[in-house]
């Protein structure tokens, strides 16, 4: 099965160049090339440098720390990447993973960090053979249509070689005299993918010629179905925030469909937030759909949170996107939200003087005011001039002295009274003045800052929460 729009039987060089052109046609961002040192990824490195060098932001290579091969492969990538004049980012695992899943998680965490740093997308060297193997592996574990799309599923990851075979890439490298290393673990029958590659697929192909192409066709049909689901989400008022770590839909979209449809939509919505729902999580999400209590939430696999919340009508109308011609739906503001645990881990900390609070800290903005506001609430605070200030995420055990609790009260109680959803709290900013909690924006203000004697001048700020 050739790549989309590319005829069969063309020379290898023309095939590779055309595959890159097709894959990059709809991609605006620069690319971080994921290169391991094997034949597929080294072909990606050399081909991209030859035919699309201006699209390369960096070359990323990850040493899993599993032995001499991993180090040699990373060194090969780094040497040739730099020889070609490309930026190379190399990292070694702090501790070797214990299985394929751990290696994959560590590698993807690294690639995503590098891509964010360059405001780029990741490009991998997955081939047509990888797609066939992945479809078979998904069948073996009982995946539904969503999982059977495998590597062809809609994704921010760019995969130029998905219509190219591993053999074609190796043959091109040999004809050009280009180097690569063969990973000895690819031949090990210890790993499921290797057993599928070397034993199961050849046996099935021998018993039923065309089996491999049939698997590819299943994957393509499933991918087409997934693209239709994704288009439906976009048209139904999807909002993606926090650098892709949070996604939401109007509650009516899910409430007005069948439980079977809800299962499909919850899985797709979760994926937009970087969350993979397992069967248990999908069932829990479907049950949660009938929840009518705003602020209710559940946690699912990986520590991700699903919640029901309300947002201001003007914010929803803006986020849904007037540029797409989508009107905010009836009952505006009530939304189901999926938020990955990673969204909380991206909260950042700042320290400095009270006169120079950061204009922006993550999704929070601090705006300095020229004078004390005529009317103010917990979103406003006056900080004494010349004091040391720290802005950091809330921590379990934080306490604040207030007019109603001069001895101090746990911030978590104020969160509860202000109806701040539990999943939101780990990202919520806390402002400390001289090491004492003085302000939790939008929630409460303390006595710590203004009540100290000899501090007449106050620097006034308003904190605003932004939505990406």
Swiss-Prot record:
Alphabetically ordered keywords of this record: ATP-binding, Cytoplasm, Ligase, Nucleotide-binding, tRNA processing
Record EC number: 6.3.4.19
Enzyme class (EC, first level): ligase
UniProt-annotated location(s): Cytoplasm
Protein name: tRNA(Ile)-lysidine synthase
Protein function: Ligates lysine onto the cytidine present at position 34 of the AUA codon-specific tRNA(Ile) that contains the anticodon CAU, in an ATP-dependent manner. Cytidine is converted to lysidine, thus changing the amino acid specificity of the tRNA from methionine to isoleucine.
GO-annotated molecular function: ATP binding; tRNA(Ile)-lysidine synthase activity
Annotated organism of origin: Gemmatimonas aurantiaca (strain DSM 14586 / JCM 11422 / NBRC 100505 / T-27)
Domains as described in the record: The N-terminal region contains the highly conserved SGGXDS motif, predicted to be a P-loop motif involved in ATP binding.
GO cellular component annotations of the record: cytoplasm
